[in-house]
Design a protein with these regions (language model features):
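Iron-sulfur (Fe-S) cluster-binding segments and ferredoxin-like electron-carrier domains
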Residues: 15-16, 52-71
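Acidic, glycine/proline-rich low-complexity segments that act as flexible tails and inter-domain linkers
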Residues: 1-36, 58-60
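Mid-chain, well-packed structural core segment of small domains
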Residues: 71-111
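Short, thiol/selenol-centered motifs that function as redox-active sites or metal-ligating centers
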Residues: 38, 42-55
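Short acidic alpha-helix initiation/capping motifs at coil-to-helix transition points
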Residues: 12-17, 47-51, 99-106
Length: 111
C-alpha cells in the first residue's frame, strides 16, 4: 500500500502525541488482540485504508482469525465475538460516531 503522507516526517509532533496515546492505551490492561479489533473497527468507520492494512496485519500477528477479521464490519450479526468484545466494539462505534449523537449510559454500563 502506497503511503500518501509520512506522518513521522511531516507531522512529527502530532505523530509523537499519537504514539504516546497509543502507548498509554496499550498499558491500560486490555489485551492487545482486543485493541486491534477496536482499532480496526474505528478504521472501518473512518474509511482509512492505510489504518486497516496496518491493524489487520497487527491483528493477524497476534493470532486473530481471518474469519473474525472479515466479519468485523458485521460483528452484531455473527457469533464470532465474545460479550466483552461486543461491548468494546459498541463503545468504539459510539465514540467514533460521536457527532451523530452521544454515548448512552446503558452502553457505559455494559463496558
Amino acid at each position: 500500500m502506497r503511503e500518501r503522507l509520512n506522518y513521522v516526517k511531516e507531522a512529527t509532533d502530532g505523530y509523537r502525541a499519537m504514539a504516546a496515546l497509543n502507548r498509554y492505551v496499550e498499558g491500560c490492561g486490555l489485551e492487545h488482540s482486543l485493541l486491534e479489533l477496536v482499532k480496526m473497527r474505528a478504521s472501518q468507520i473512518n474509511g482509512c485504508a492505510y489504518c486497516l492494512d496496518m491493524h489487520s496485519k497487527d491483528a493477524r500477528a497476534l493470532g486473530e482469525s481471518e474469519q473474525r477479521l472479515y466479519a468485523l464490519n458485521a460483528w452484531r450479526e455473527t457469533p464470532f465475538f465474545t460479550e466483552r468484545e461486543r461491548a468494546a466494539l459498541a463503545l468504539t462505534e459510539a465514540a467514533t460516531l460521536i457527532a451523530n449523537g452521544h454515548i448512552a449510559d446503558e452502553l457505559y454500563a455494559e463496558v
